[in-house]
Amino acid sequence: MPRHKFATAITCIDGRVQQPVADWMKLHANCEYVDLITEPGPDKVLSSETTYVVDEIIRKVSFSVKYHESPVVALCGHHDCAANHSNREEHIEQINLGVQVLQSYTLNVRLLGLWLNEWGSVELVCDTEQREKLEVRL
């Protein structure tokens, strides 16, 4: 598998999230750099009707895909999110819905749904390359 220069991650602004997600992306998306697009509670935002915020996220993702040729985009939710007080199960549902919203924009990239758990470990929730929803232990 050829190594890509960039991948893209949509994460929370919470400083505990970026490094573990970037490290996971470098390993599992086979890239050198990760463009970070931050938004408070991005899983909740992308799974809701907040159109203007979604449009802004899509604008930034499109920039990363176009100019950095990012072939992989991940949406990540996390434990103890100040902007999204949902429980783990609700976060997982929002991540899956958010990935579906991203798919509707025809970005022509592999989309991943990620969950950063209470121990700071990244879990894969869904992967459009696998063409089916991964079952995550709830």
Residue spans of the language-model regions?
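Divalent-metal-activated hydrolytic enzyme cores
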Residues: 1-21, 32-33, 40-53, 63-72, ...
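Short, aromatic/basic amphipathic alpha-helical patches
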Residues: 22-26
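Short, small-residue-rich loop/turn micro-motifs
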Residues: 38-40, 77
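Acidic beta-strand-to-loop metal/phosphate-binding motif
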Residues: 72-78
